[in-house]
C-alpha cells in the first residue's frame, strides 16, 4: 500500500475568529482531494473553537505541548488537555520552537515521547539552517535530530509524520529545489532503513516544509520520497486548497 499523502497547514501565531471562519469556509468549499489527509495547526486558544466548525475531512493539531500531563508549568499545555478538547494531533520540534525558543533535540524527543504515550499523533519536525547547509552539514544535522527521536518514538511509528523543513528556505527568499528536497527525503529514508527498519522506512510519511506555495507544490508532490507538505503562510490563504490537491 502506498503512503497516504498528508498536508498540514501550520497557522502559527495567526488568525482571529473572523479570519479563522474565512479559512474554514474555504476548506469546506474545497473541494479537497479525498485521498489526502489534511491537518491544520491551530493556536492553542482556538483549538476548541476550530474543532466545532471544521469539516469532518480536516483534522486539527496543536502547535506545541509540554512533556508532562499537568503541573506547575505556567503558559504550557499538555497532551491530556489537547485530547480533552477532542484534538488528536500535535506539531513538535518546529524550527521556530528550536531557534526562537531554544528547544534542543533532547527536549523535543521528551515531548514527542510523552505526546505519543498520551495517545496523540505527532508531526515531528527536523531541518538544517542556512549556515549548516552551506557548511555541508545537512545530513549530519537531520540525522542527529532524527536519531534523538528514534528512542522517543519506540514502536509508535504509525502515529508519526516526519516533516523536513530546511530552515534556510523559510522566509529567506531562498528556496529548495524539488531535487534538493527529494535528496534529503531519500537520505532520511535510507537512514531509517539502516537504523530503524526497512518497514518503517517504507511506511513513514515525510512531509516537506520550506516555503511551499501553490506554484511549487505540484512539482514537489511528484518527488518519490515526498509524502506531503507542512505549509506555513500559504495555509492562511485560499491557495491552501490547491496545495492539498497538488498530488492529483
Swiss-Prot record:
Alphabetized, the UniProt keywords read: Gluconeogenesis, Glycolysis, Isomerase
Binding-site list for substrate: 12
Q: What are the recorded GO MF terms, alphabetically?
A: triose-phosphate isomerase activity
For this UniProt entry, what's an example GO CC term?
cytosol
The record's listing under InterPro entries reads: Aldolase_TIM, TIM_sf, TrioseP_Isoase_bac/euk, Triosephosphate_isomerase, Triosephosphate_isomerase_AS
Q: How is the subunit organization of this protein annotated in UniProt?
A: Homodimer.
| Similarity section | Belongs to the triosephosphate isomerase family.
Q: What is this protein called?
A: Triosephosphate isomerase
Annotated source species = Bombyx mori
Amino acid at each position: 500500500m502506498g503512503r497516504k499523502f498528508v498536508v498540514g497547514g501550520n497557522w502559527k501565531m495567526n488568525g482571529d475568529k473572523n479570519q479563522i471562519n474565512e479559512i474554514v469556509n474555504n476548506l469546506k468549499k474545497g473541494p479537497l482531494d479525498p485521498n489526502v489527509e489534511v491537518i491544520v495547526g491551530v493556536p492553542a486558544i482556538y483549538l476548541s473553537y476550530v474543532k466545532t466548525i471544521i469539516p469532518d475531512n480536516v483534522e486539527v493539531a496543536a502547535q506545541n505541548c509540554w512533556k508532562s500531563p499537568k503541573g506547575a508549568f505556567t503558559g504550557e499545555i499538555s497532551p491530556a488537555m489537547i485530547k480533552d478538547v477532542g484534538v488528536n494531533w500535535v506539531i513538535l520540534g518546529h524550527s521556530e520552537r528550536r531557534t526562537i525558543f531554544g528547544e534542543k533535540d533532547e527536549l523535543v524527543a521528551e515531548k514527542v515521547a510523552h505526546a505519543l504515550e498520551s495517545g496523540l499523533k505527532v508531526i515531528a519536525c527536523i531541518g538544517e539552517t542556512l549556515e549548516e547547509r552551506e557548511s555541508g552539514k545537512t545530513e549530519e544535522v537531520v540525522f542527529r535530530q532524527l536519531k534523538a527521536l528514534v528512542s522517543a518514538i519506540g514502536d509508535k511509528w504509525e502515529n508519526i509524520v516526519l516533516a523536513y523543513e530546511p530552515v534556510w528556505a523559510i522566509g529567506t527568499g531562498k528556496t529548495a529545489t524539488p531535487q534538493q528536497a527529494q535528496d534529503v527525503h531519500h537520505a532520511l529514508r535510507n537512514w531509517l532503513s539502516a537504523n530503524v527498519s526497512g518497514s518503517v522506512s517504507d511506511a513513514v510519511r515525510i512531509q516537506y516544509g520550506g516555503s511551499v506555495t501553490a506554484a511549487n507544490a505540484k512539482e514537489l508532490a511528484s518527488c518519490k520520497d515526498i509524502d506531503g507538505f507542512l505549509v506555513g503562510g500559504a495555509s492562511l490563504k485560499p491557495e491552501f486548497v490547491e496545495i492539498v490537491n497538488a498530488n492529483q
